[in-house]
Amino acid sequence: INLVNIVFIKLLEVYMIPVDDKSQFGSYEANQVVALIIKITRSLGSKWISKRLIFILRRIAIYFSKQCLDTVLFDSNLRLYTKGNVSEKRALFSPQIFEEEERNFIASRASDNSIFIDIGANVGLYSFSVSQKYKLFENTKIFALEPHPDLFKRLLFNQNLNSHLPIFPKRIAIMHKPGEFFLNTPKENLGQGKISQKGELKVEGLPLSNFAEIEGIKKISAIKIDVEGNEEKVLLPFIIEENRSLF
């Protein structure tokens, strides 16, 4: 094995972090240095200089961190991983600049019987961020849909930590047609997976209208979709006149 291969293997070991969904919450408590950095980065603003400072401090904190951290975020107990998923790192250290306007809009749609569908949920950050508002109303549901097996395990673990919230994880890929597809994911960012006809991970795909029928959904209050450039292909078959009653 030459030097290049050794370096490549070491990099994969950094990114391929096993999912710990067995240990109790609190097992990965931040040490004093990391806790202080998180407190600082979460208090900073959204201007360029603040973002640069957050980036620098985040790198320092990750260096001194374990593979994941147990934290309170969005008024929920969450276990977030420090490597291999950009979304988790951003939310962990700087939730104030984590698409706040979009999350506030989705939260504003909450009322009795509201349904929010989080397509490409990753570890459920959008779902958890709005769930505190949705739980205030009767018969609300947040469907967090994520096909990647490791991300889904993390999502399910966090949902179990917060079982009082109306979040319902489903391991499924919303697609333009039903069937089995493949998910190709870069090891350095699990949240960047793309659906294709061949690849590493086989996932089940289902059109949004089919999913709504299976779950007995009559009206959708809000949808968030992040499927790495496949958004139009997924949504256009759904936005037709015969589905008008759903939205």
Where are these regions (language model features)?
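Phosphate/nucleotide-binding beta-alpha loop and adjacent structural elements of enzyme active sites
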Residues: 5-247
